[in-house]
Amino acid sequence: MQNYGLVFISLACALAAQSSFADAKQLRQYSASIEQSAWQLTAKTPLLCQLEHVIPNFGSAVFQSKASKALNLNFELKMLRLPDAYSLAEVLSLPPAWRPGEPGKSVASMSLLKQFNGELPKKTAWTLLTELEQGFSPTFYYADWYSPYDQVAARLNPVQFPPGYFAFTECVARLLPFSFEDIAFTVLSYESGSDQLTPESKRRLGQIAEYLQHDPQIESVELQGYTDSYGGRWMNEQLSVKRAEKIKQFLAEAGVAGEKVQVDGFGERRHVATNRRVVLQMARP
């Protein structure tokens, strides 16, 4: 009877220990300290603005906006250890210490895909920036893929946020209102019988020149000149080359290396209804 009692006590202790262990799932927290916290503008051009915050031993948080017709913003949570399976991270905004008793806010759920960083779309990204501006700490909670006993919390520290955020918003306000995709294929039209661009094409060419000044990744620019069917064929072909060469000269003055630009004149060949034009095509990696 005494042996049965000992077995019962041992079993009860084991079950209690197991229950206690399950309830005490560890939370690994990553956050920059007050001394470490920094918000840096790591890209500042008319094509790209990028605000970055390093989370020691975890990775970094990156807000990015690119030149485009529409206002855009993307958030990326870069992780040193990428997800090993699909899961969700709960995004909460936690109040600062000087606002005790205030509950955290549920901001969103972020999909975590295998071997990819986490990303959030424009609306949620702006919400995170607004929370940081008010002194809150957006925090990402998820189950650890590499340990069944742990959860992870990655926290953005709002200390030193205002100066970086102000520089970022200034940069975003100065982004070009068009992207590479908007100008990579452009048809420039001419006044009849001359090498003068129409007003709209002049404006478009100015945009292209401005873009080319800031994008060193442009590999090639192809210019194809065409005329209408009025006048002799030889004269039209020469006019089409002259038009394309004039565009090439304009691009050279904008800083585009001559070896990157290829010129072809087709005159009235490949004729279409409105054929007085130069077709400009750009390529990059």
Language-model features: locations:
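N-terminal signal peptide c-region/cleavage motif recognized by signal peptidases
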Residues: 17-19
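Second-shell loop/turn segments in exported
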Residues: 115-119, 190-198, 233-237
